[in-house]
């Protein structure tokens, strides 16, 4: 099998040295992606295209699909390579391939040549087109908007019959731009923004702020691995997980309600910037869109960026949610995002849309930055290639109950302001208010003879916290969903 790779047009307008560098990098990327899929693959670069040849015909579809997902490729031509003697031989070979496709259809012939010949491209188009028109009575020539375009490429003494054209990802080859660190949550926005930077030639590493439990972390790892495996597997990247529950707990205890959202984002940027500096990464990537939530106003974004000198890229800044979801659907992350949990108790009730720098800094003076230093120092870094193996491990499950048994103790793990606004009142059961950010440290002090059922408004945080406790060896926990 043989494929002709056509370059993304922006590559072709670069200077000679830059163009050659981009083509060399793209050639290497193609080799890296195809090497695990097919043996004895030959990838040869030329000035205006790249050739891919392989012997295993059974893997043709697999190779074609992989090529369509490599950034830097405008389109792929699947071709049959044959020698020819003259224009009539070209016509006969074309007729043999296209006869069935052209029945009852309008068509035109398009020819591209490389090398020296005794004929022009237009002469071949006219000769072959006229022959097809005469030998296929039901076919008709239409030069504008035909139903079938017969694409031929002539390279010296070889005829390339194009079996099909397949669109690529476009963009720049990964590795032509510098590395970035994507703050990924598993939702619609962060997945799409990560893809957009990969498509622009960046090697994208991932930083995940874990707010509770392995289930969410595994879900986000699967999104990151999917994006890497589908669009960026030509390069090795890192996945960095930071346990941010202690930071959230400190914010909920020490920071005024209206300032929590901005302070939390500032802490995330601080932490991510340190990770980026550790690995020599040039910029952060977020999925923020202007005005989408309270922390994403211009005033608040400026304050968030002010805590670090690291460049923060926001490729979705002017996109609306509907467009972002459509992009997620196109790249295949929509289903992941739909099932990704949102956390109750993390978002403030009355967030400010126009934070004041002096007020934010005053609130942050109450924050113990030793906690932030500790979680960054304890961040877990792994090669993203190891995620697939790790995800195959069994995830501990936890039982969800709708009614309470005699003797059950309900742990209300919502934040204190939620507990005050909407108290959980149960006539026949004991209720203990224990915010989720204190649960991990305080649960061991409870009477372990009793059975504890965890409650929160949406049931997401309670399930994640119950999973965490089960992983720590506590079997006396359930999730309460009345």
From Swiss-Prot:
Catalytic activity entry: [ThiI sulfur-carrier protein]-S-sulfanyl-L-cysteine + a uridine in tRNA + 2 reduced [2Fe-2S]-[ferredoxin] + ATP + H(+) = [ThiI sulfur-carrier protein]-L-cysteine + a 4-thiouridine in tRNA + 2 oxidized [2Fe-2S]-[ferredoxin] + AMP + diphosphate; [ThiS sulfur-carrier protein]-C-terminal Gly-Gly-AMP + S-sulfanyl-L-cysteinyl-[cysteine desulfurase] + AH2 = [ThiS sulfur-carrier protein]-C-terminal-Gly-aminoethanethioate + L-cysteinyl-[cysteine desulfurase] + A + AMP + 2 H(+)
InterPro entries: Rhodanese-like_dom, Rhodanese-like_dom_sf, Rossmann-like_a/b/a_fold, ThiI_AANH, ThiI_fer, ThiI_N, THII_Thiazole_biosynth_dom, THUMP_dom
Domain THUMP: 61-165
UniProt KW keywords: ATP-binding, Cytoplasm, Disulfide bond, Nucleotide-binding, Redox-active center, RNA-binding, Thiamine biosynthesis, Transferase, tRNA-binding
EC class: transferase
GO biological process: thiamine biosynthetic process; thiamine diphosphate biosynthetic process; thiazole biosynthetic process; tRNA 4-thiouridine biosynthesis
GO terms for MF: ATP binding; CCA tRNA nucleotidyltransferase activity; tRNA binding; tRNA-uracil-4 sulfurtransferase activity
Listed CDD domains: PPase_ThiI, RHOD, THUMP_ThiI
Cellular localization per UniProt: Cytoplasm
Domain of life: Bacteria
Disulfide bonds: 344-456
Gene3D superfamilies documented for this protein: 3.30.2130.30, HUPs (3.40.50.620), Rhodanese-like domain (3.40.250.10)
PROSITE patterns documented for this protein: RHODANESE_3, THUMP
Enzyme Commission number: 2.8.1.4
Residue sites binding ATP per the record: 183-184, 265, 287, 296
Pfam families documented for this protein: ThiI (PF02568), ThiI_fer (PF22025), THUMP (PF02926)
GO cellular component: cytosol
Listed pathway(s): Cofactor biosynthesis; thiamine diphosphate biosynthesis
Active-site residues annotated for this sequence: 456 (cysteine persulfide intermediate)
Domain Rhodanese residues, every copy: 404-482
HAMAP family: ThiI
NCBIfam families, A to Z: ThiI_C_thiazole, tRNA uracil 4-sulfurtransferase ThiI
Family: Belongs to the ThiI family.
Functional description taken from the UniProt entry: Catalyzes the ATP-dependent transfer of a sulfur to tRNA to produce 4-thiouridine in position 8 of tRNAs, which functions as a near-UV photosensor. Also catalyzes the transfer of sulfur to the sulfur carrier protein ThiS, forming ThiS-thiocarboxylate. This is a step in the synthesis of thiazole, in the thiamine biosynthesis pathway. The sulfur is donated as persulfide by IscS.
Protein's name according to its UniProt entry: tRNA sulfurtransferase
